[in-house]
Structures are given as C-alpha cells and as structure tokens.
C-alpha cells in the first residue's frame, strides 16, 4: 500500500477493499475491476482507495499477492508421492483465490504490478515447494540433478498456468496420475523405473 501523509489508514477498511477487489476479480475478471465498482460495493469513497493504491493494478497486486496458491505438501515418503500430493489441488475446481489470480494471467504479461502479485502468490511458493521436494529426494538418496529439478519446476508451473487459463475445470485422478507418470517423473529420472522414484 502506498498511502499519503495525513490521517492514518484504517486497516479494517483496507481489508474490506481488498476483499471486494478479490470478489470482483474472481467473479467478473480483471476487466471489471475499477474504483467505482470497488467503492460502491465496499460503501467507501474512491479517495480511500487511491490513498492506498495509486492504480487498480497496484490494488490487484496487494489483493492477490497475499495468497499462497501452492502449498508444500507434508513428506509423503517418496518423490512420486510428494509430487502427487503437490498436484492434488488440480483435482478440485478453482477456488475464489485461484479464480482471482487466474483473471490476471493474460494482463500480467504487460503489467509489472500484476506480474509481481502472481509471482508472490504462485511462482515463488511453487519454486519453494519444488526445492523442498528435491531436497527430500536427496535426503532419501535419490538426488535429482539441479538442471532437471529446474526443468520439473518449469513444466509444473506451465501446467499450473494452463489450469488457470483453461475453462476445463478440475482434472480427474487418472489424468493427474498420467501427467505425473508420463511427463513429470521421466523429467527427473529418465533412466529409472518410476516405481523406484
């Protein structure tokens, strides 16, 4: 939040404004987020919005950047099972936070604030999860070379973005297993049987 000198900003109003912004992004999309709509829904003045965020992109960054859209799974005992737990989210429809983030994907290509919000919500948490999963594999004596781990992260991220831009909805358990066994595991262990990973 930016804010200007003067009266302190109300944290409660800030939260209310961000919640309204998330609702608009999730239900109507980035193109419908504007100060008039936010102010009307929040029953607040537009000045209160612009004291906090100079642009709607800055507001969207604050709203979405607070999310953690990827969670590092608990240790499942194997690389395959850790990855399966990470990808389990793909089996459910997009929730409110994911729909809000998804609404920014196309526009983020041309807007630094939107990109930063998505980086904070998805890109960095996913990279941390992949790093943790790779470290666990190494601790089990199944080290994944750094280059292959980076490739794994890039491919999973691409699938995540596809999930956000597709109208297809959730994947089935079988589809997730097929992606895992036929695409992801061969990236990290091309010479090993998947069952041993």
Please place each PLM-identified region on the residue numbering.
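C-terminal peripheral helix-coil segments that are non-catalytic and often amphipathic
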Residues: 1-2, 85, 92, 135-139, ...
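Short loop-to-helix capping motifs
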Residues: 28, 97, 107-112
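Hydrophobic alpha-helical segments that form the core
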Residues: 127, 131, 144-166, 174-185
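Short amphipathic alpha-helical segment with a characteristic S/N-K-E followed by hydrophobic residues
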Residues: 17, 32, 55-60, 70-71, ...
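Amphipathic alpha-helical packing segments from all-alpha helical-bundle domains
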Residues: 96, 103, 113-139, 150, ...
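Hydrophobic alpha-helical connector segments
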Residues: 70-100
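Basic, helix-initiating cap at the start of DNA-binding domains
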Residues: 1-41, 47, 58
């Amino acid at each position: 939040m930016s804010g200007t000198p003067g009266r302190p900003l109300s944290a409660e109003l800030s939260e209310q404004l961000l919640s309204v912004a998330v609702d608009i992004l999730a239900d109507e999309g980035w193109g419908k987020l504007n100060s008039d709509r936010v102010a009307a829904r929040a029953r607040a003045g537009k000045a209160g919005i612009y004291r906090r965020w100079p642009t709607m992109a800055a507001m969207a960054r604050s709203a979405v950047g607070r999310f953690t859209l990827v969670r590092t799974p608990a240790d499942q005992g194997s690389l395959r099972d850790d990855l399966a737990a990470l990808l389990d989210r793909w089996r459910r429809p997009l929730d409110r936070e994911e729909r809000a983030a998804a609404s920014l994907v196309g526009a983020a290509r041309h807007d630094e604030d939107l990109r930063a919000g998505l980086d904070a919500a998805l890109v960095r948490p996913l990279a941390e999860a992949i790093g943790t999963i790779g470290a666990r594999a190494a601790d089990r004596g199944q080290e994944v070379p750094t280059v292959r781990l980076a490739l794994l992260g890039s491919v999973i991220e691409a699938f995540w973005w596809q999930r956000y831009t597709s109208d297809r909805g959730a994947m089935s358990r079988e589809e997730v297993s097929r992606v895992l066994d036929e695409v992801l595991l061969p990236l990290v262990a091309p010479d090993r049987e998947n069952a041993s990973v």
